Structure formats: structure tokens, C-alpha cells
């Protein structure tokens, strides 16, 4: 297994698929990384040389925020919304859908499980 930006990526997968194991890199960015570093995207990770792996790792570190850095930035952005008290921040605080979805009949994932009802004895 190759290690890129502190994450072990599977060695038996193709490069453009294996790069998606990094938080913040999807299909488009993975192909872009392969193109800019000159690595064949259909090559298996175990077939890569150390030079190619280091080239990919340095390109990612120079051009993208990934893993912990990206996670902290996203958390910081959400915290900022909550601190300024805007509508989106309030929805985050209350644990409700943020992007305008209906909540009367759906949104169970965001709201969590329904509170249990107490059953009366004797009925």
C-alpha cells in the first residue's frame, strides 16, 4: 500500500480510483492529478515507482487542501455561521436540514430518531 498525505491507499486499485480514498479528492480531481503529474490513471498503484508516488504527493500538497486541513476548514466555516447567528447557522445548531428541505414529514436523518412515546398500562 502506498502512503499519500498520511493515508494508505489500496495498491491493487487503479490510480484514479485509489486517489479518491483521500478526503477532498473526487473523480475529477483524481483525473486532473494524474494528467498534471504525467501518471497513467489506468495504472495500478502497486506498479507505480517511488518517484511517481512522491510526484503525486507533492502535487496534492501544493495545490489542494485534503484530509485534516480540509475537515478543519469545513468545521470552522460551520462554526462561523453558528457564531454570527445567521439562518444557516441556526439550522446547524438545531440539528435541522440547512438547505431548505421540508421537515414536517421527512428529515429523520438530520433530526435523529423519534422520541419514544410512553404507553399507558391497562390498555
Curated annotation (Swiss-Prot):
Give Gene Ontology CC terms: cytosol; small ribosomal subunit
Q: Which GO terms describe its biological process?
A: translation
Can the keyword DNA damage be found in this entry's annotation?
Answer: no
The record ties this protein, via InterPro entries, to: Rbsml_uS13_C (IPR027437), Ribosomal_uS13 (IPR001892), Ribosomal_uS13-like_H2TH (IPR010979), Ribosomal_uS13_bac-type (IPR019980), Ribosomal_uS13_CS (IPR018269)
- Residues in the signal sequence: none
Q: Which GO terms describe its molecular function?
A: rRNA binding; structural constituent of ribosome; tRNA binding
| Biased composition range(s): Basic residues | 101-123
> Do you know which PANTHER family this protein is assigned to?
30S RIBOSOMAL PROTEIN S13/40S RIBOSOMAL PROTEIN S18, SMALL RIBOSOMAL SUBUNIT PROTEIN US13M
What does the function comment of this entry state? Located at the top of the head of the 30S subunit, it contacts several helices of the 16S rRNA. In the 70S ribosome it contacts the 23S rRNA (bridge B1a) and protein L5 of the 50S subunit (bridge B1b), connecting the 2 subunits; these bridges are implicated in subunit movement. Contacts the tRNAs in the A and P-sites.
Would you tell me the protein name for this molecule? Small ribosomal subunit protein uS13
Q: What is the lineage of its organism?
A: Bacteria, Thermotogati, Thermotogota, Thermotogae, Thermotogales
Gene name for this UniProt entry: rpsM
